[in-house]
Structures are given as C-alpha cells and as structure tokens.
C-alpha cells in the first residue's frame, strides 16, 4: 500500500506541487482524481476529509491517516516530517528557515490567487469582463516584477538552494501561456500581454531551472498522462 493518498485533479496547478514534493522525497502515493463536472470534490467522503471541498487533500497512512489540505501547508508538513536529508527544505534552526515560510505565503496570496483569477476571467467566466482581465494580468506582471527583483542576486529564493519555496511557484507559472492566450473570448480591446522571457529574464531562467529538475519532469509527465485519460 502506498504511504499517501492524494485527492487531486489533473488540470489544477495546486495538486501538482504536492506530487513534485512527494517525488523529490521518494515517497509513495496513490492519486484519487476528482471529477469537477460531477462536483466530486464536494462529495460527503471528501468533505469529511477537507471541509473546504477543494484539492489537494493528502492522507498520510504512516501517521494514523493524518489528513492535511492546502497545498503549501502540505509542503511544510512533508518537509518537516519526511525531509530528513533536507533535499527540499531547511532545518528549523537555519537562520533563513522562516524565509521559506515567507515565500510560501507570498506564493499563496500573491501568485496563486491572482493567477487563478486571471485564468478564470480569461477561460471560464461566462462573459467577457475587460476590466477584470486587465486588472489581474497587470497584477501578474507586478508579482513577476517582485520575483525579478528578488532573483537579481540569487539563483533560488532562499539560501541559494532549491527548497519548497521555489517548488511552490512552478505549476502556476506553467499556466502563464494559457492565462495570456486569447482564451474563449475574442478580445478587441487592448489588454496587457506578456513576453515572459523578455520582460522578466531572471524569473524566466529560474523557472526553466526548476523545470529541469528530474522530479519536475516526472511530475509534468504524470500530469500529461492524467489529462489524456
């Protein structure tokens, strides 16, 4: 039996953060994909585990079926409990430990929410709302500018090494091309566009460095297979 059960969805970015962390730490897991069109994430079974009814939700069968949700909280849990070799984290007594936590909060409040809303209004919303698309695309560029400034003198966010702080940004940054595509609307008005590599070269290079990790490649290969099923 696998150590973990991961409630997930093939399309959503957040579960794939957890998948990569599990792969980085060589931990075994079984994935349960929910069907959003059938509202399976709101099933009684899942709500009993996660009252927010969203994914990811992780169950640790080696810890009395301990259950935790919210992707960045899961990253902290896995790092604190299972990253004994500090492959993707820092020890609690490291002077920059709390910087890792800082960037996880920044990812959740700065990147995840904004990228998600930008994608919603470009791809899923029922009507074209130019003001919303403009606002969220501009906010994406602001957040990328913050990262660009942070990365001006370093290759990674914390302690000049890969940690869960970096990992947390990967899957949402992979969605930038989709977010800035035309989407389902024909937009005649002028809205913000993005040339990731040209406008934010340090952040783009950082993202490519993260994607080159073996666990990253394995994660997104797994996602591609899940999308095909």
From Swiss-Prot:
Residue span, GST C-terminal domain: 93-229
Signal peptide per UniProt: none
Molecular function, one GO term: glutathione transferase activity
Keywords carried by this UniProt record: Transferase
BP terms from Gene Ontology: cellular detoxification
Enzyme class name: transferase
Inducers of expression: By heavy metals such as cadmium.
Family per similarity comment: Belongs to the GST superfamily.
EC nos: 2.5.1.18
Source organism per UniProt: Schizosaccharomyces pombe (strain 972 / ATCC 24843)
Transferase listed as a keyword: yes
Transcription in keyword set: no
Catalytic activity line of the entry: RX + glutathione = an S-substituted glutathione + a halide anion + H(+)
Stated name of the protein: Glutathione S-transferase 1
Stretches assigned to the GST N-terminal domain: 2-86
PROSITE patterns: GST_CTER, GST_NTER
GO CC field: cytoplasm; cytosol; nucleus
Xref: CDD domains: GST_C_Ure2p, GST_N_Ure2p_like
Stored InterPro entries: Glutathione-S-Trfase_C-like, Glutathione-S-Trfase_C_sf, Glutathione_S-Trfase, Glutathione_S-Trfase_N, GST_C, Thioredoxin-like_sf
Function noted in UniProt: Involved in the oxidative stress response and detoxification.
Domain of life: Eukaryota
